[in-house]
């Protein structure tokens, strides 16, 4: 009903975020299988080009009007979205998926840490940090991790932090439709880079269907869902809930790639999940939950 408002259930944006993270992990596995054919920059170009077309067709962003104070955050939102994709795909060329995701998570973890105000919030962040610490193959195995790939994953994490902070401001009015504009900004910068490096193979008929699947799983679906969660969850809660990402990556590697987990790593996953659950349970103590118009 026009002009009416309804308070969304607290659990709904959390469920939306979990679906988005699962979709991204599925897309990352598929994307990595395309690296031998078109390279990481080429997959980035496919993901952004096809994903942007889907988002534009669905959200029709030319109808949106952004206030002057939203334009700069929107620009940085789009640039960080593209940089996050590009650097992450470069990193998983040489770094295992689970490790790359864990290193990339330093971005949202930093957002959660610096946004914490109450002791209980800090507890969940510390618990997530401990989980990530033991999840990473520190010690003997760490010598086998490519340092350049690890640095690229950390760079992707920095872009992720900017994505979270600017996404909340840029999407405050238009919600998930903002993703279409942000993705277009990212595509303008990073699609030409990937297209030049991949060459004609990028647009081969056998590659395009797989690229479309990557675009849907890794861009169109999850970023739309994440924007819903971004504009309806506190910053620290969103950042801490994203700690599920490396846990999902590790479990995905175990199921689909045959990777085994040690007892300590299993405990680390439990710590990360506990941090996410704790953060979720404390949402109800927030003064307000964002309301949305139901048109």
Curated annotation (Swiss-Prot):
It comes from the Bacteria. The chain crosses the membrane at residues 8-28, 39-59, 72-92, 94-114, 119-139, 147-167, 176-196, 201-221, 238-258, 263-283. GO terms for molecular function: threonine efflux transmembrane transporter activity. GO terms for cellular component: plasma membrane. Residues 1-7, 60-71, 115-118, 168-175, 222-237, 284-295 are cytoplasmic. Pfam families: EamA (PF00892). Residues 30-135, 159-278 form the EamA domain. Residues 29-38, 93, 140-146, 197-200, 259-262 are periplasmic. It is a multi-pass membrane protein. Keywords: Amino-acid transport, Cell inner membrane, Cell membrane, Membrane, Repeat, Transmembrane, Transmembrane helix, Transport. InterPro entries: AA-Vitamin_Transporters (IPR050638), EamA_dom (IPR000620). Belongs to the drug/metabolite transporter (DMT) superfamily. 10 TMS drug/metabolite exporter (DME) (TC 2.A.7.3) family. This is Threonine/homoserine exporter RhtA.
């Amino acid at each position: 009903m026009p002009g009416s408002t309804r308070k969304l259930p607290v659990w709904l944006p959390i469920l939306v975020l979990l679906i988005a993270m699962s979709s991204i992990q599925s897309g990352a596995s598929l994307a990595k299988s395309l690296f031998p054919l078109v390279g990481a920059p080429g997959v980035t170009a496919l993901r952004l080009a096809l994903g942007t077309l889907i988002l534009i067709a669905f959200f029709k962003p030319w109808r949106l009007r952004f206030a002057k104070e939203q334009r700069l955050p929107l620009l940085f939102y789009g640039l960080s979205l593209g940089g996050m994709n590009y650097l992450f795909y470069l990193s998983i060329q040489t770094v295992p998926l689970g490790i790359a995701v864990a290193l990339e998570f330093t971005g949202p973890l930093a957002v959660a840490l610096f946004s914490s105000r109450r002791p209980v919030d800090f507890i969940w962040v510390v618990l997530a940090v401990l989980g990530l610490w033991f999840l990473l193959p520190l010690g003997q195995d760490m010598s086998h991790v490519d340092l350049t790939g690890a640095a690229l994953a950390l760079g992707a994490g920095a872009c992720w932090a900017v994505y979270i902070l600017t996404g909340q401001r840029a999407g405050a009015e238009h919600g998930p439709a903002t993703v279409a504009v942000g993705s277009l900004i990212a595509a303008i910068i990073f699609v030409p880079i990937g297209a030049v490096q991949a060459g004609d193979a990028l647009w081969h008929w056998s590659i395009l269907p797989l690229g479309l699947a990557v675009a849907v799983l890794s861009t169109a679906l999850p970023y739309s869902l994440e924007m819903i969660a971004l504009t309806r969850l506190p910053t620290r809660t969103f950042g801490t809930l994203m700690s599920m990402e490396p846990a999902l990556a590790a479990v995905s590697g175990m199921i689909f790639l045959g990777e085994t987990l040690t007892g300590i790593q299993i405990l680390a996953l439990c710590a990360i999940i506990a941090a996410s659950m704790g953060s979720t349970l404390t949402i109800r103590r927030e003064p307000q939950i964002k309301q949305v118009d139901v048109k």
